[in-house]
Amino acid sequence: MRLLVSNDDGVYAPGIKALAEALKTIAHVDVVAPDRNCSAASNSLTLTNPLRINRLDNGYIAVNGTPSDCVHIAIREICTEEPELVVSGINAGANMGDDTLYSGTVAAAMEGRFQGLPAIAVSLSARTPVHYDAAAQIALRIVEGLKAHPLPADQILNVNVPDLPLEEIKGIKVTRLGARHRAEGVVRTTDPAGREIFWLGPPGEELDASEGTDFGAVAEGYVSITPLTVDLTAHSQLNALANWIEKI
């Protein structure tokens, strides 16, 4: 089995090392990741600057681009054989609810799907996570399960793991995305030269963390697995929209 591993925290992050080392026990693993932290890069691609790669001593490849760049260039140019699965992570921090739209971790998995490959994104739910090895073992089990149960062509799996020792994780729940309140306001301040600068405020508090959501599962000590679709169409609204838009 051949796997491509990437992330958005960067090629030097502890999460990608833990993930790659665990997966190497069952597969050939290529690691291609950003040369710096690219959190919240979403699905952005680099179109106005050239991409360069740097082959590190440990065999990993660093790219001066976004997570989506890394997966795209890895599949198209770097991997000597096409991988069978893309695994993104392990992210330092959860990617649940609305966060998935901003997440570079989820975006790397989505890029794998755009390139025709099944993919999963793995995140460790804590501000300063500790138990990367536990999350890596969960990822390993999911990858092994996917051998017998391949993903549909239009889906990825978004996996969020509570930051607990493996033996304290209660189990796995299949969930839907929860939701957050609006993000907190922008912070306006000045730099040392007196020039005005802005910092984006932190994400809003959880709005929907009810039973069945990713937020709810992780809060209870369970791994959350949410199947995400690439199709963003609001299918339930098509007829209602057509009824009035045709009269314009």
Curated annotation (Swiss-Prot):
Q: Which Gene3D superfamilies match?
A: Survival protein SurE-like phosphatase/nucleotidase
Give the matching InterPro entries: SurE, SurE-like_Pase/nucleotidase, SurE-like_sf
Q: Where in the cell is it found?
A: Cytoplasm
List the disulfide bonds in this chain. Answer: none
Predominant localisation class: cytoplasm
The EC number(s) given in the record are: 3.1.3.5
SUPFAM superfamilies listed in its UniProt record? SurE-like
Question: GO CC annotation: what is one?
Answer: cytoplasm
Ordered alphabetically, the record's keywords are: Cytoplasm, Hydrolase, Metal-binding, Nucleotide-binding
Known function: Nucleotidase that shows phosphatase activity on nucleoside 5'-monophosphates.
Name of the protein described by the UniProt record:
5'-nucleotidase SurE
What is the organism of origin for this protein? Answer: Shewanella amazonensis (strain ATCC BAA-1098 / SB2B)
